Amino acid sequence: MDVKAAPNGVATIEDRILRITGYYGYYPGYSSQKSTTRSSVTRCKPGPNCPSSHSSISRQLSPLSVTEDSSAPILELQSRGSSGVCGRRVERQSRSGDDGTQTRPESSSQENGLKARCLSCTSMVLKTIWGLLIILSVSSSWVGTTQIVKITYKNFYCPFFMTWFSTNWNIMFFPVYYSGHLATAQEKQSPIKKFRECSRIFGEDGLTLKLFLKRTAPFSILWTLTNYLYLLALKKLTATDVSALFCCNKAFVFLLSWIVLKDRFMGVRIVAAIMAITGIVMMAYADNFHADSIIGVAFAVGSASTSALYKVLFKMFLGSANFGEAAHFVSTLGFFNLIFISFTPIILYFTKVEHWSSFAALPWGCLCGMAGLWLAFNILVNVGVVLTYPILISIGTVLSVPGNAAVDLLKQEVIFNVVRLAATIIICIGFLLMLLPEEWDEITLRFINSLKEKKSEEHVEDLTDVSVHLRSRSRVNGTVSIPLA
């Protein structure tokens, strides 16, 4: 229904409303021309044709204006509105495209991070499993060696011959290593090439006759002396006492490294060394300072001291060695023992110090079992450093003490009094303190701080949960509660 024009020139009700409300850009006849412009104005859609649509809108709206000044605000609003919508849509598309390109590398980096974490977790689990197996193997081989020596002493007591015989088995260390190399390595090398590669532990020129005599002789003597004193101690003391006293070598290694190699001073290791010395004195006191007990303790402490000196000199002159270099070096010690130290058991045999009736009377089963377990112990110690954490190897060594104690109790060869038990525990605790890393205090502080942060976070979460619960209850009851946090 048409409405007649009013005296003030307003033709329709819509024009009246627009005039009363003060619509920006109002001009007379706006409502009558609006219907014609709706059909001609096209909405802007995102795409390359958006600017052309803007120009068509301006061309179609320009005849509607009565004057240039009255139509300018409308054109400006129309163009701004349309360009704003189009621009926002185009910006959204471009942003979504940019976000898509940015999320792809982020997602790929997240996938790589997850893969790396999975691999690290898998390697950690494998190292732990290997560590547990090697702990059992190391402790079992050391306990077996000690107990077989005690059994052999019942019918055959020639400690130096037993030491010489077991040291000769070290020659098989490198062949065992090379067999593992052939079984696991992708690029296999010849025995001579691998031998030359591993001989770099002696220097860039490899193993020469001069280096063979200069470097191998002192280490071979220390190796033989360590094992010989250990076997002598087993004649005077029980297997539990000797294995516990031998654990003092960690304390002696620290003291020698601190004095000779100028290693870092650590108070906790000084405490461990004092505990080891205390355990030694208590072990001698356990039998009321009996003559055999004191001599046995001296032999065991001497074995631990020569073992510590061997390790410190190895670190000083040869440095660190990988598994192949260690296998080469131990096999070289076996060759040196076979060539240059064989005259010693011969002299002891003819001087009746270590004499046996015939070679057929020798307990070959016990001798081969002792030598095989000793070789297995040395191989496991060097393999364990490659497959798992070195600290687990040391734990396997200290676990030989309760292992020997269990066997001695079953054989009823030892009676544990309070002093002997306390001495054994003190030495084992000192050994474990020696295994603490150099940054153990910083690691402990970090761990304590992380625990405090977790507790504070849990406390804040509990407070927020309580406040949310109180709010919900107050809303149900129609009251307003003040949040606690």
Swiss-Prot record:
GO terms for cellular component: membrane. Residues 225-285 form the EamA domain. Residues 88-98 have a biased composition (Basic and acidic residues). Keywords: Membrane, Transmembrane, Transmembrane helix, Transport. Residues 32-42, 50-64, 99-111 have a biased composition (Polar residues). It is a multi-pass membrane protein. The chain crosses the membrane at residues 129-149, 156-176, 217-234, 241-261, 265-285, 294-314, 329-349, 359-381, 383-405, 414-434. InterPro entries: EamA_dom, Solute_c_fam_35_mem_F3/F4. The keyword Membrane applies. The keyword Plastid does not apply. Residues 32-64, 78-111 are annotated as: Disordered. It is found in: Membrane. It comes from the Eukaryota. Pfam families: EamA. PANTHER family: SOLUTE CARRIER FAMILY 35 MEMBER F4, SUGAR PHOSPHATE TRANSPORTER DOMAIN-CONTAINING PROTEIN. Belongs to the SLC35F solute transporter family. Putative solute transporter. This is Solute carrier family 35 member F4.
